[in-house]
Amino acid sequence: MNHPVFKPSFARTDARGVFHEIRNGDEIWKSVNLGEMRQGAVLGNHYHTTSRLFFFMLSGKVRIDFLHAKTGERDTIELNPLEGVYLEPYESHAILFLDSGRFMLLKSEAFNPKKPDIYPLKADEGGSR
């Protein structure tokens, strides 16, 4: 399993401030979320069967442990501010906040409480913690 880390593809700075283009592609996101977590918080330890996600750090640092639900393959990456990664279907993910931080989460599907597409699976068991 390989998880490339994405950085902004474009940045413009002028007298008004800074503008970063995070992704420029043909993805269509149905859910856009902003979050803020404390140091030591863990998100995830689950996977999705149909949803594709893009997780992007705005501030702070995280470690993400991946475990593929079908193959058992593992991967671990760290993200710093202005870095992001795709979370593909069947990839269980445990996102550990190494610092307090803010993030953006884009989802290919809106959350449906009647059919949540969330399946518990600890990705950080036996990992590098």
Cite the ranges covered by each PLM segment.
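Double-stranded beta-helix
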Residues: 2-4, 9-12, 94, 98-129
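Short beta-strand His + acidic residue motifs that chelate non-heme Fe in jelly-roll/DSBH
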Residues: 19, 45, 64-65, 87, ...
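Tight coil/turn sites that cap or link beta-strands
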Residues: 37-40, 82, 88-90, 100
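Glycine- and acidic-residue-biased ligand/ion/polar-headgroup-sensing regions
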Residues: 50-63
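Short acidic-glycine-tyrosine-enriched beta hairpin
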Residues: 69-89
